[in-house]
Amino acid sequence: MSAEERLIELEIRVAEQEKTIDELSSVLTEQWKTVDQLSKKLNALTNRFLELKEQAAPDVPVTKPPHW
């Protein structure tokens, strides 16, 4: 394999790797959006659950654990 052929092969590999990195970056961005949406929904559901629990037993205060 000549030096020129090796250079072409390396350039092809770099181009393929750049494409893969771009694709992975896009997927990661979409996953973070999904995680953020799910986190917001979980917080809303947790708050709603605590409200309903308080309504069911109004004389017993419900507080979130310290790690919330």
UniProtKB/Swiss-Prot annotation:
Similarity section: Belongs to the SlyX family.
Transmembrane segments: none
Coiled coil location: none
InterPro entries: SlyX
One Pfam family cited in the UniProt record for this chain: SlyX
Origin: domain of life: Bacteria
Protein name, per record: Protein SlyX homolog
